[in-house]
Amino acid sequence: MDALKKMKDFKPNRIVCLTEETVETLYLLGEQDRIVGVTGYAVRPPEVRKEKVRVGAFTSADIPKILALNPDLVLTFSDLQADIAAELILKGIDVHAFNQRSVEGILSMISMIGSLVGANRKAEKLIADYTKKLETLRKKKTEVLKVYIEEWDEPLISGILWFSELVQIAGGKDVFSDKSKNIDAKSRILKSDEVIKANPDVI
């Protein structure tokens, strides 16, 4: 019975987040005390820089440093961190890889994180708040501006789908919206003359 009770009550209390989104979401849910390590790119909220141990970049990670934190869950993102995830799994670490590519996918990620840490109601409220803000933004009448979304600079990579969707919701037009549907970042690589030819109003 004790073993069954322990399984029922299990929630990860030593989480390592290798993506910015999961860090920010846990803070917004008030579950930041569960975080023991973060990606070096985590900057929101500002206090995360002082409060949490940094364990690597986006496509690289200090595996020994992560293991030393004795995590009971590591949160990763997509195929870009597949090698890191595989190495941690081989070390016996539980890993959950998110793959959010759209606004809907982001909201789903928030819901899943809420479930993982037992903060379902707080996650539902956060999702409802975001949905309301997006609807308000969608209803605003604005000048349609052509927007170039630069996800990366070397090489130039245009924005992923959720970037493009947010621009559209705000009343703009993503000049490379056709590429935004491509999951693989390599298929969104641009040449500088393509950006010049697109003649965006906003970058």
Residue positions per predicted region:
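N-terminal ligand-binding lobe of clamshell/alpha-beta domains
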Residues: 1-203
